[in-house]
Amino acid sequence: MTSPIVTRFAPSPTGFLHIGGARTALFNWLYARGRCGKMLLRIEDTDRERSTTAAIDAILDGLKWLELDWDGEVIYQYSRAARHREVAEQLLASGMAYRCYATAEELAAMREKARAEGRTRLYDGMWRDRDPKDAPGDVKPTIRLRAPLTGETVIEDQVQGRVVWQNENLDDLVLLRGDGNPTYMLAVVVDDHDMGVTHVIRGDDHLINAARQKQIYDALGWTVPSMSHIPLIHGPDGSKLSKRHGALGVDAYRAMGYLPSALRNYLVRLGWSHGDQEIFSTEEMIKAFDLPAIGRSAARFDFAKLENLNGHYIRHSDDAALVRQFEDVLNYVPNGATLKAKLNDATRAQLTQAMPSLKERAKTLLELIDGAAFLFADRPLPIDAKAAALLTPDSRALIGRLHDALAAVEPWSGPATEAALRAFAETNNLKLGAVAQPLRAALTGRTTSPGIFDVLAILGRDESLGRLKDQTTS
């Protein structure tokens, strides 16, 4: 019987949940969910100076927004420091670790000498076999792993393949600092072991850590989890991802109007492929995702592709669900509170009614908000430059006549106003476009909007006639 799959997402709370971290969380989540396993969440807060509560909150909020749930309670690494120290002492007792009394000055000299000689092994092992009786009384020792000096450390990585390090190039790494605090390397191994993690899926910037951590596993006689080191995300030109290219927090993507479903779909295709398929439902992702299908080369972030994908998701979203997304994003955009204050049962109903037309033109929720601005505008309506150019004196006179024609429509509806406008155009020997364009400018303050008959129906009689009256000349 095989043991259940357990993955983990283990961010450090020193900043926001960046896009690379979000993809790592997604890959862990998909792998676990597709195999009836668990994904655990561990906050690696051992760096007390840089870890912040605000960063922890941002990570949790980002995961919740992406709808990536975890199993069990959040584990905080620092709270397990006593257990980490216990394991360090265990290694010390077994002879697989030793106390090192090297001073900061001695260590600096070792590093300088090693670099001058072109060696990657920086620590010279001065306390590896030295009698502890020689220990200076004024130095608080670290505990170092007694790493093998010869042979190889090998990882069979599910993404990178077989990766080999020569042990002569790897240091006796520090497990416990002089102040008694465990290092990241030790804490990760102990936590993964104690939590039953079977699969470690993380960025390939951690690949060198895998070698060091395997040596700790071997020293303890513990089973090494399956390792998968996924390629990093680069900018579209292949350079390191920058803020200009998309190296932003998940919260920034929410504020830019991206849907969590679209961002998940985009992220899963950054480095992973399943034939030529580009669009995946969550269920399809869970079913199809596997580690060997992840490529080794860096994925390239493309804002235009994300935007187009987001537009697809907006167009195919349920209208009521989009209204909820619309309202939610107002909490994260400038002047969102002003617009949110105008949302009530009546305006929500108008927004829902307009959504089939609005969503066809929008690639982000911000574009959706912009397209819906005419619904929430106060009278007299602000008119943009392009619309103002249409509202010539002749057009305003025409609007006055249109006002009178529409005032006679009863009952008010899209089909009824359409019939009235077509009759007006025919009677006055005008093309419908010559009527619709100034009418749109007067009703929405823009030159683009949902269909003009839809606009009239959504605004209703009183608001439509009032806006036309505002733009009429005597």
Swiss-Prot record:
A GO MF term: glutamate-tRNA ligase activity
Enzyme class, top EC level, equals: ligase
> Pfam families from the xrefs?
Anticodon_2, tRNA-synt_1c
Its Enzyme Commission number? Answer: 6.1.1.17
Where does the sequence pass through the membrane?
none
Query: What is annotated about its quaternary structure and interactions?
Result: Monomer.
Which family, according to the similarity comment?
Answer: Belongs to the class-I aminoacyl-tRNA synthetase family. Glutamate--tRNA ligase type 1 subfamily.
Q: What is this protein called?
A: Glutamate--tRNA ligase
In the UniProt record, the gene name given for this protein reads: gltX
